[in-house]
Design a protein with these regions (language model features):
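The feature captures the conserved acid-bearing segment of alpha/beta-hydrolase catalytic domains
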Residues: 24-109
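Short beta-strand immediately N-terminal to the catalytic nucleophile in serine-hydrolase-like folds
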Residues: 1-3, 29
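Active-site-proximal flexible loops/turns
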Residues: 12, 37, 130-134
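Conserved aromatic-histidine-acidic binding/catalytic patches
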Residues: 2, 88-92, 124, 132
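Short glycine-enriched nucleophile-adjacent loop
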Residues: 8-19, 135-137
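Short, internal active-site loops enriched in acidic
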Residues: 6-8, 73, 123-128
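C-terminal catalytic histidine-bearing segment of alpha/beta-hydrolase fold enzymes
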Residues: 81, 101-149
């Protein structure tokens, strides 16, 4: 499953909030902001979520095969959520991706939860789905064989 920008926001929240365990490989790219697994109010954190998030769900999310991609030049403010809650996550998509990923590493370490996500910085790419898609395809199709894009 692949999502870019708002699509990435949808996928990571769907993986957190749904009861669907069928997602075997997810790539989220250049999300504008995230739902952190912390005490911030929903939707910026998981405090007061519309549904109960079980510890089992958090463990599944953390151990899922998920790849977070971010363009190394995705630092613009175009169509970026600049609300107070979003700005607490970082000043741009690149900072927010780094902060979100780091928060998941820390959560895993503190709670002894296996963390299987990977972080990929796609150099010289800004907020461009067409430039992120080749990297996402290589990840999603890695077990198919030699992929030339």
């Amino acid at each position: 499953m692949y999502g870019h920008s708002a699509g990435a926001q949808f996928i990571h929240r769907y993986m957190l909030l749904s009861n669907d365990y069928r997602i075997s490989n997810a790539v989220i790219a250049n999300a504008g902001w995230y739902t952190f697994l912390n005490g911030s109010n929903f939707p910026y954190g998981i405090k007061d979520t519309p549904i109960n998030i079980s510890s089992e769900r958090v463990r599944w999310l953390m151990s899922s095969k998920t790849n977070l991609l971010i363009g190394g030049s995705d630092v613009g403010l175009q169509s970026l959520n600049t609300s107070k809650g979003a700005m607490r996550q970082g000043n741009n998509r690149l900072e927010r991706a780094n902060n979100y990923f780091s928060s998941l590493i820390l959560l895993g370490e503190e709670n002894k939860i296996p963390f299987r996500w990977n972080f990929h910085l796609i150099k010289d790419v800004a907020h461009s789905n067409s430039e992120m898609t080749p990297a996402a395809a290589k990840i999603l199709l890695a077990d198919v064989g030699d992929i030339k894009l």
